[in-house]
Design a protein with these regions (language model features):
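Hydrophobic anchor at the beta1->P-loop junction of P-loop NTPases
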Residues: 5
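Short, solvent-exposed loop/turn segments at secondary-structure junctions
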Residues: 10-11, 57-59, 98-100, 144-146
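A glycine- and Lys/Arg-enriched "phosphate-lid" helix/loop adjacent to the NTP-binding pocket
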Residues: 68, 82-130
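Conserved substrate/cofactor phosphate-moiety recognition/catalytic segment
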Residues: 8-11, 15-68
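A basic- and aromatic-enriched beta-loop-alpha substructure that forms the phosphate/nucleotide-
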Residues: 51-95
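Walker A (P-loop) ATP-phosphate-binding motif of ABC ATPase nucleotide-binding domains
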Residues: 2
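Conserved beta-strand scaffold positions in the cores of enzyme catalytic domains, especially
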Residues: 26-28, 52, 92-94, 136-138
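NTP-dependent small-molecule kinase module
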Residues: 111, 124-164
Length: 164
């Protein structure tokens, strides 16, 4: 079982990833800005089984603009990685929430990077566009608890698995 949870900061990815990992008996891998973010890194990460990824390749298509840095992947590389992940049965989900909720959640954390706070509308819009482009289920977490979101994801995964 491999699950990728993507989305804007403050949408509940980490909380949902932990619940899913407990449910499926998986590890959580939290990908961060310190990871290499190149083609080999994402390709090799697929070697791990029984994992819930808290962020993965989609973030590399969003955050270079936010942090004013060079992209580490070419568009065709990210397309290839996502296609291959899906071919291998990786379950992708994009979490969204309304802008105000994301900001409130991030403010409660404290110490959030100002570049993220000032770019929430862009980050949300970009993740929504990527979910549409890659046909990835999008779940709005604005009025849902992490438990409820995890249950929705489990239901989608079970329906997919039963179709095989």
């Amino acid at each position: 079982m491999r699950i990728v949870i993507e989305g804007c900061d403050g949408t509940g990815k980490t909380s949902v990833a932990k619940i899913l990992a407990d449910h499926y008996g998986c590890d959580v891998v939290h990908m961060t800005g310190d990871d290499p973010k190149d083609f080999d890194f994402y390709w090799q990460s697929l070697r791990k089984n029984n994992v819930v990824y808290d962020r993965n390749v989609l973030g590399e298509l969003v955050y270079p603009y936010v942090f004013d840095r060079k992209k580490h992947l070419k568009d065709e590389q990210s397309d290839g990685i996502i296609s291959f992940y899906k071919h291998k049965g990786v379950h992708f989900f994009v979490l969204t929430a309304n802008e105000g909720i994301c900001k409130a959640r991030l403010m409660m954390r404290g110490n959030e990077d100002q570049r993220i706070l000032s770019n929430i509308p862009y980050i949300l819009a970009k993740f929504k566009a990527l979910a549409f482009e890659y046909n990835i289920p999008e779940i709005n977490t604005s009025q849902r608890s992490a438990d409820r979101v995890a249950k929705e994801i489990i239901k989608v995964i079970e329906e997919k698995e039963n179709k095989k």
